[in-house]
A protein has these predicted regions:
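A short beta-to-alpha transition loop/helix N-cap that caps and shapes the active-site region
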Residues: 24-31
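S-adenosyl-L-methionine
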Residues: 31-80
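Conserved SAM-binding motif I beta-strand of class I
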Residues: 17-20
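Conserved Class I S-adenosyl-L-methionine
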Residues: 128-147
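Positively charged N-terminal leader segments that act as targeting/secretion signals
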Residues: 158-172
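Short, small-residue-biased leader/transition segments that mark boundaries at the very start
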Residues: 1-5
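A short helix-to-beta-strand connector/capping loop
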Residues: 15, 60-66, 138-140
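Active-site segment flanking the S-adenosylmethionine/decSAM binding pocket
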Residues: 65-124
Length: 173
């Protein structure tokens, strides 16, 4: 994640970077959903070791970093007027991923990219389920990314001219 912060800051040197995190790990509510669907072995509080100061310390320019602490999507109300050119979504679990996808995609600039971590991860199949449902509902395609996290990316095709010879986008299962 440190390297991702550095590279994102370098790629967008003149933009604000919004970071959404609970800084408390996974919630009991989300873990209950994961367990009922046999989607992961995650536990309440996993990933709770992240703190705001350590995150700001690795950001190339902390003055351009906006922290949104709390449970997603509740914290999204702070940015309803924003348009995003790049979103890196690493929610891991089904419920927060399913809640985040439509909110961010709706505000993604034309040609913007939504990068979702753990889509092809064997550790968090709830993320894959959420992305699959979102792509099928919206006729989108999640392109696999060759990384260690099983990531995929969705490009915003709104208003963008599509090649009429390409097949309709879908999600790879």
């Amino acid at each position: 994640q440190r390297q991702m912060c550095i590279e994102t800051g370098a790629a967008f040197p003149d933009r604000k970077i919004h970071l959404f995190d609970t800084f408390e790990g996974f919630s009991e509510k989300d873990i209950t959903i994961e367990a009922s669907g046999n989607l992961s072995r995650a536990k309440t509080g996993d990933f709770s070791s992240t703190d705001i100061d350590s995150v700001l310390h690795v950001m190339p320019d902390p003055t351009r970093t906006v922290i949104h602490k709390g449970w997603f999507p509740d914290t999204f109300s702070d940015v309803t007027d924003e348009t995003f050119c790049f979103v890196s979504l690493d929610a891991d679990l089904y419920a927060p991923t399913a809640a985040a996808l439509p909110l961010f995609y709706e505000r993604l600039a034309t040609g913007g990219v939504l990068l979702i971590h753990d889509v092809y991860s064997t550790q968090f199949s709830g993320c894959r389920k959420a992305v699959g449902e979102f792509c099928l509902k919206n006729h989108l395609f999640a392109d696999p990314v060759c990384d260690l996290h099983g990531s995929a990316m969705i490009e915003n095709y709104k208003k963008k001219r599509r090649n009429r010879y390409l097949p309709e986008p879908a999600f790879l299962f």
